[in-house]
Curated annotation (Swiss-Prot):
Pfam families, per the entry: MutS_I, MutS_II, MutS_III, MutS_IV, MutS_V
Residues annotated to bind ATP: 618-625
Stored Gene3D superfamilies: 1.10.1420.10, 6.10.140.430, DNA repair protein MutS, domain I, MutS, connector domain, P-loop containing nucleotide triphosphate hydrolases
Gene from which the chain derives: mutS
Assigned GO CC terms: cytosol
Biological process, per Gene Ontology: mismatch repair
Xref: PROSITE patterns: DNA_MISMATCH_REPAIR_2
Function: This protein is involved in the repair of mismatches in DNA. It is possible that it carries out the mismatch recognition step. This protein has a weak ATPase activity.
Keywords of this entry: ATP-binding, DNA damage, DNA repair, DNA-binding, Nucleotide-binding
Family matches, as CDD domains: ABC_MutS1 (cd03284)
Family: Belongs to the DNA mismatch repair MutS family.
Name of the protein: DNA mismatch repair protein MutS
One of the record's GO molecular function terms: mismatched DNA binding
Origin superkingdom: Bacteria
Length: 856
């Protein structure tokens, strides 16, 4: 019943009319409606909250003639429930009581004061500290897509113009947004499957002119040329929608969102969605973080450093100058052992990046200011540590750290050493910071001494030995006397409360003092909140410089982390070459070597202009996939400035990394395993270049032998002769090992294994040449296939091999392929393939039909 017909509102009680009106304004999210010490949910919201949160579903009387489904949760536990809801992509509007129940006629005045959505979180308790929290918007044009992401918790705003569906899929995989806005006309909803927090927005929110006005107003500029994005029309439309959504949900100024950058695919190595998934960069195939490249490389000191590292992993650089700048910084940190002390210093900084976002939104809490004070206090020591380093990139980062002595001194004077969680109850501002506040606090805090003196004086005056002076929050100050002695109280004692064995009284003097104290407490709290707001005003003029400080500290953290990982894990600095190629000596898989229970077998790889494709053969479980992945991961690590697990690595320029490794049904899109495999293969064949690194594993296994072999052969041939990409091509089709005899630049390598009787030992060592056999039956036995089945399979294998040897004149599959004549070009088909029917008039179409008839 959450869609409201305003004509029916009069049927409901005044309170429910108020609720339903607010719900109509926030129809696409749960409405937490404050009633006393609880947040209540009604109707469909109550049913959904009961299901999602496991809270009781009850009913609250009737309104409009029907029982009202209701669910509630205590206000003090709301953050825990919010965390659960945003994790599953649910948005919440929080409606608070802003009126005074004592003076209200009718329902207490209420207002939605906070909107919590997965992509607009800034509260520390609701965020994953080592993951970016991205809000995204996507807009589809006639050709291509506009894509924008915004991290409200840091202010990072990025747009991208994407030409193809595959590019958008890769960006979604790279950025992994927690909330996605899309237009009503968006036609690729299948790409959003698996993402939580999807929001369909009206088309007008993506209007180009409106978007430009919003962005110019946000950045305070006359145009967008300074950001280098003026021509990015589609992504600016997406960015405008994001900006409007954030303004609607945050309902405050957003000064920390002060720049926007453009993601250019040409600046980094392109990784498509399949590659990011198959290489398990920051997420494993089960959706977790364990046993990923990020899990191995991340020993950063700060959450902001961890988040930056993950962004680097997904954006390997192409410019060798930038890569070498990082390498030089890491080398110097390692050679001087400066990374050891730097790690501890950076760790004490905390998450300044997100603290600055909360300061900008004025939602920071007292402990945020305390952490900022600590970080600023550590800056001189950090600057001193870096002053001995001379690597250009480190020197540049040191300059961006800045100096903030005035701000640090202010926070030192203003904030107590261990502030409470919230400003609500006071106790945040340090004594001595403001004389007026000290005076009001003195009146309030002097109450204890006054009450002791009053109690002693009244005991002496009345002679009542059971007399006590006390205070509680309900009745205020009182004089308590035992019931047995209550007849002895003076006439100026006015009864305030009767208990079982006690009577409580108030006197004119005590009443006057109570009003004075309570007034001073209220005035002290009001003044403290005023001083608290002034702290924001003092700090925010330095917002941009403090954001630079946070970014520089995060990058220093990543570089220091690279030095530590190189030392701890035995990594070496890769060499960068201007010549295309990947040459690795004793390379290791960075993840497998960390989780393996046995010593990892290091292996080489050599790819260059004269050796562009390796046909990789060997048994299942022999290590083919591990070997191929380690080549890709070492190449990627080299391009983020990280040292690599190898004795030596020489890496040339790379434009893209492709992987076609493993496959499963894509049930959501209705695609079989073989269809998924062929789609990924087609993407590689269409987009790979001579500067690409391609990993192809078991192409063609999802269909018949002849079909599969034909596809594998043709794909390998196309990559070797037409594309010239650096390729590792793993296969169980041993016929493909004949390719090196037919094509230049193609070589065989294999993973070694030793067979003894019916057992097999995998050596995991890469050797030149083709494997002698596949050892499929031995692997099946290791997997636990029953002995009877293995014996029957051996018998059938012997029959097949014997028949092949005895069948005179028969051809092997590869011989059949090689014997086929080259296809003859058909002029009619050639002409037909060049026609675009959308561009033909009826007369032209008729003429073409006659021409095709003549050519056929």
């Amino acid at each position: 019943m959450n869609v409201i017909d305003t004509d029916d509102l009069e049927k409901h009680t005044p309170m429910m009319r108020q609720y339903l009106t607010m719900k109509a304004e926030h129809h696409d999210m749960l409405l937490f409606y404050r009633m006393g010490d609880f947040y209540e949910l009604f109707y469909d919201d109550a049913k959904r909250a009961s299901e999602l949160l496991g809270i009781s579903l009850t009913a609250r009387g009737k309104s409009g003639g029907d029982p009202i489904p209701m669910a509630g949760l205590p206000y003090h536990a709301v953050e825990g429930y919010l965390a659960k809801l945003v994790q599953i992509g649910q948005s919440v509007a929080i409606c608070e009581q802003i009126g005074d129940p004592a003076t209200s006629k009718g329902p207490v005045e209420r207002k939605v004061v906070r909107i919590v959505t997965p992509g607009t979180l800034t509260d520390e308790a609701l965020l994953q500290e080592r993951q970016d929290n991205l809000l995204a918007a996507v807009y589809q044009g006639k050709i291509g897509f506009g894509y924008a992401t915004l991290d409200v918790s840091s202010g990072r705003f990025v747009i991208a113009e994407l030409d193809t569906r595959e590019s958008l899929e890769a960006e979604l995989q790279r950025t992994n947004p927690v909330e996605i806005l899309y237009s009503e006309d968006f036609g690729e909803l299948g790409l959003l499957n698996g993402f939580k927090g999807k929001r369909r927005r009206p088309e007008w929110e993506f209007d180009y002119d409106t978007s430009i006005k919003l962005l110019l107003a946000q950045f305070g500029t006359k145009d967008l040329h300074g950001f280098g994005i003026a021509d990015a029309r589609l992504s600016l439309q997406a960015a405008g929608c994001l900006m409007q959504y954030v303004k609607d949900t945050q309902r405050t100024a957003l000064p920390h969102i002060n720049a926007i950058t453009r993601f250019n695919q040409t600046d980094s190595i392109v990784l498509d969605a399949a590659t990011r998934r198959n290489l398990e960069l920051t997420q494993n195939l089960a959706g977790g973080r364990d046993n990923t490249l990020a899990a191995v490389l991340d020993n950063t000191a700060t959450p902001m450093g961890s988040r930056m590292l993950q962004r680097w992993i997904h954006q390997p650089l192409r410019d060798p100058k930038h890569i070498k700048a990082r390498q030089q910084a890491v080398t110097e940190l390692l050679d001087t052992a400066a990374h050891e002390g730097l790690h501890e210093q950076l760790k004490a900084l905390g998450d300044i990046e997100r603290i600055m976002a909360r300061l900008a939104l004025r939602t920071a809490r007292p402990r945020d200011f305390a952490r900022l004070r600590q970080a600023l206090g550590l800056l001189p020591e950090l600057q001193q540590s870096l002053s001995t380093l001379s690597a250009p990139h480190t020197t540049q980062l040191r300059q961006h750290l800045g100096e903030f002595p005035a701000e640090q001194a202010l926070l030192e004077r203003a904030i107590v050493d261990n502030p409470p969680m919230l400003i609500r109850d006071g106790g945040v501002i340090r004594e001595g910071y403001n004389s007026e506040l000290d005076e009001w606090r003195g009146l309030s805090e002097g109450a204890s001494d006054y009450l002791v003196q009053l109690e002693a004086r009244e005991k002496e005056r009345t002679g009542i030995n059971t007399l006590k002076v006390g205070y509680n929050r309900v009745h205020g100050y009182y004089i308590e006397v035992s019931r047995l002695q209550s007849s002895q109280v003076p006439l100026n004692y006015q009864r305030r409360q009767t208990l079982k064995n006690m009577e409580r009284y108030i006197t004119p003097e005590l009443k006057e003092y109570e009003e004075k104290v309570l007034s001073s407490q209220g005035k002290a709290l009001a003044l403290e909140k005023q001083l608290w707001e002034q702290l924001f005003d003092f700090i925010l003029p330095k917002l941009h410089e403090l954001q630079d400080f946070a970014r520089a500290a995060a990058e220093l953290d990543v570089l220091s982390n690279f030095a530590e990982r190189a030392e701890t894990l035995g990594y070496t600095c890769p060499e960068l070459s201007q010549d295309i190629g990947v040459q690795i000596e004793a390379g290791r898989h960075p993840v497998v070597e960390r989780v393996s229970q046995t010593p990892f077998i290091a292996n080489p790889v050599t790819l260059h202009n004269q050796r562009r494709m390796l046909i990789v053969t060997g048994p299942n479980m022999g290590g083919k996939s591990t070997y191929m992945r380690q080549v890709a991961l070492i190449t990627l690590m080299a391009h983020i400035g990280c040292f690599v697990p190898a004795d030596r690595a020489l890496i040339g320029p790379i434009d893209r990394i492709f992987t076609r490794i493993g496959a499963s049904d894509d049930l959501a899109s209705g695609r079989s395993t073989f269809m998924v495999e062929m789609t990924e293969t087609a993407n590689i064949l269409h987009n790979a270049t001579a500067s690409s690194l391609v990993l192809m594993d078991e192409i063609g296994r999802g269909t018949s032998t002849y079909d599969g072999l034909s596809l594998a052969w043709s794909a390998a041939e196309y990559l070797a002769q037409q594309v010239g990409a650096m390729t590792l091509f793993a296969t169980h089709y041993f016929e493909l090992t004949q390719l090196p005899e037919l094509m230049a630049g193609v070589y065989n390598v294999h993973l070694d294994a030793i067979e003894h009787d019916d057992t097999i030992a995998f050596m995991h060592a890469v050797q030149e040449g083709a494997a002698s056999k596949s050892y499929g039956l031995q692997v099946a036995a290791l997997a636990g296939v029953p002995n009877k089945v293995i014996k029957a399979a051996k018998h059938k294998l012997q029959q097949l091999e014997s028949r092949d040897h005895q069948a005179e004149g028969t051809r092997t599959p590869i011989q059949s392929l090689l014997a086929l004549p080259e296809p003859v070009e058909n002029p009619a088909l050639t002409k037909l393939s060049s026609i675009n029917p959308d561009n033909l008039t009826p007369k032209q179409a008729l003429d073409l039909l006659y021409e095709l008839k003549r050519l056929s």
